[in-house]
From Swiss-Prot:
Annotated localization: Cytoplasm
PANTHER family in alphabetical order: ISOCITRATE DEHYDROGENASE KINASE_PHOSPHATASE, PTHR39559
Classification lineage: Bacteria, Pseudomonadati, Pseudomonadota, Gammaproteobacteria, Alteromonadales
Annotated positions binding ATP: A324, P325, G326, I327, R328, G329, L330, K345
The name this protein goes by in its record: Isocitrate dehydrogenase kinase/phosphatase
Physiological role: Bifunctional enzyme which can phosphorylate or dephosphorylate isocitrate dehydrogenase (IDH) on a specific serine residue. This is a regulatory mechanism which enables bacteria to bypass the Krebs cycle via the glyoxylate shunt in response to the source of carbon. When bacteria are grown on glucose, IDH is fully active and unphosphorylated, but when grown on acetate or ethanol, the activity of IDH declines drastically concomitant with its phosphorylation.
Record's keyword terms, sorted: ATP-binding, Cytoplasm, Glyoxylate bypass, Hydrolase, Kinase, Nucleotide-binding, Protein phosphatase, Serine/threonine-protein kinase, Transferase, Tricarboxylic acid cycle
Top-level lineage group: Bacteria
EC numbers for this chain: 2.7.11.5, 3.1.3.-
Catalytic reactions of this protein: L-seryl-[isocitrate dehydrogenase] + ATP = O-phospho-L-seryl-[isocitrate dehydrogenase] + ADP + H(+)
Family in the record: Belongs to the AceK family.
Active site: residue positions: D380
A GO BP annotation: tricarboxylic acid cycle
Amino acid sequence: MNNTHSSVLNKVAYLILHGFDKSYRWHSRITRDAQQRFEQALWQETQKAVKERIAIYERTLADAVGEIYQQVFPHQENNQFWFDLKTRYQKILSDHPQYELAETFYNSVLGRIFKHQKINDEMMFIMPTRCYLAGLQRHLVVHSFDTSGTVRRMLEDIFSQYHFDIAFQDMQRDLQHLDGALRARLNREQLASVHTVEMLKPVFYRSKSAYLIGRICMPDETLPFVIPLSIAEAETSGEKHKIVVEALLTERQDLSVVFSFARAYFMADTQHPAEVVAFLHELLPHKKKFELYIALGLYKHGKTVFYRNFLAHLEESNDQFSIAPGIRGLVMAVFHLPSYGVVFKIIKDEFPESKKITRQHVKDCYKLVKMTDRVGRMADTHEYVNFRLPRHRVEQALVDELLDCCASSIELTDEEVIIKHLYIERKMTPLNIFLEQQPDPALITSALNDLGLCIKQIAAAHIFAGDMLHKNFGITRGGRVIFYDYDEICYLTEREFRTLPKSDDPYAIDTLSVGPTDVFPEQFEHFIVGKKHLKQELKALHGEIMTAEYWQHMQAQSLKGDVPDFIPYNQAKRFVN
């Protein structure tokens, strides 16, 4: 290797690393400021910070690629240059505290340069370069607490390690609540057997809440130990806000809901994300590590880990990709691999006349959801380009379907089906299928009630779901209804909610002047669910969503800038309701 070649490799490798470091510093700064926003109850600033942090990656990526083009002409370099560059970059990452994220950033740079056409492990970090040994850096991210004294003393020790700039409203009351809740969860023998309590050092901030996350370690069992915090806002401008302990969560299901794929990303400041994810994975072993990276707002690396998991699953399975069950959409073609827990969604080339939207509009809607607090009711999605499937694993019926409705997004080779653009989303049972197949009337009622709550909670987040046919909702294994069809989603303030005119003339509605943003909620009862008895039951449970007055009230709340509380865990767990 000549000196010039080596010098250029060094320069480009360090440009990429500097780009990543800049990105992560910026990400960390916004994350670190979450404490101040929480303590000062700056809820609108919190929402802005979420959007700003998501946008950082693309901005720093564009800067890094631009700087590389000033140093080399990438397309004039042969493949050996890029093989050598990966090796050089790998060497300078040897002691980097976020090496796994830096590898993903490298992949993004090369993906941008080559428009994602050259995806191979010789040139990029398709597979990880090392096996992360969880626990070696545990002391950097975890506080360990002595449990030989009283429960009260242990709790006091825990709070002494978290340094807030405002006081608790009533610490003695909060300690009493926590003490009582822990004693209610563990019997005397279990309490006596607790040998350690470990708490993550970063505080996890999201929306109007903060979480202290840890675990109780016993010889035969380890339980989550999670303390949600909220702000009691000051009544006068001269006073400071106060912190309130909301609950104690000790069940994995409660923590799983807190880390749901349908919620906004946390802000948890750490320089050792892999160790934090490893700890969380021990608490939530049924969650994939890619889900936990994404929950921390490291969604680009989460996508990398997902893709690695996906490739491993392909090696271990033999079923075929097929059209997803359910009613086919007007805007998206949806398919799945039956043995895998996601669906793949491709924007169709053409939409029916009833959908007065464009391809870019659909992309903008999906971006809006990414940037919004999804309040546990809207599924997160992940965007990929040039996503490759082995052709022998794709059913011919699916190939034919994709070529028929998404031809501009599909490239076929003898070996692969290459999808130029798609979204990946968690797989759920479509609500219409659930309602058709569920024999238990109580579970049907529960699902319909949750459907209404889903629509209301999305509205409380200042979002109008748009196309609210029940086929556009899914239901999770836990019975939670989630919205997942975003092509008509918009802010509440972008719609005009109107009341239908009262008239005995059956043709009056045909002559009604309707603008492009007009919505008549009274019509919702006719199309949200299909069968008459389901319509009646939904109306009995949530009839207000079928009135213009309800939506006008929600618009007024949105215009005032109100940010409601969205408590992810069971309200019954709260100490003070």
